[in-house]
């Protein structure tokens, strides 16, 4: 019974992912790094104040250096308080000025 319930949960998750694939992977408003036509797309959910996100940042940078076929879609989720919201707003302003990547990299160092 547990196994069939787990299989149904996995199937439901796959259906939900398929239903939202465009919003996750192909939203033209989302900033991204890497190859715009990459054959592999990674979606990174982050908060610039998150220590785990900061620790993971060099790994993503290294992946992009090594594999020119990767596109990383960036989803800023400001969940760690008012300073996270302020940083998210700054990133939006930077995106409008074509400076998102530079600010993103600076905030996650």
Label for each model-derived stretch:
Residues 1-7, 78-109:
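Cysteine-centric redox/oxidoreductase cores and disulfide-bonded domains
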Residues 1-85:
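Extracytoplasmic thiol/disulfide redox context detector
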């Amino acid at each position: 019974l547990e196994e069939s319930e787990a299989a149904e949960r996995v199937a439901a998750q796959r259906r939900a992912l398929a239903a939202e694939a465009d919003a996750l992977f192909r939203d033209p408003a989302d900033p991204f790094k890497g190859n715009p036509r990459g054959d592999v797309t990674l979606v990174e959910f982050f908060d610039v104040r998150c220590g785990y996100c900061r620790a993971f940042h060099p790994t993503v940078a290294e992946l992009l250096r090594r594999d020119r076929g990767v596109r990383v879609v960036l989803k800023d989720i400001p969940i760690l308080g008012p300073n996270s919201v302020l940083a998210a707003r700054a990133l939006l302003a930077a995106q409008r000025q074509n400076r998102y990547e530079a600010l993103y990299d600076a905030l996650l160092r």
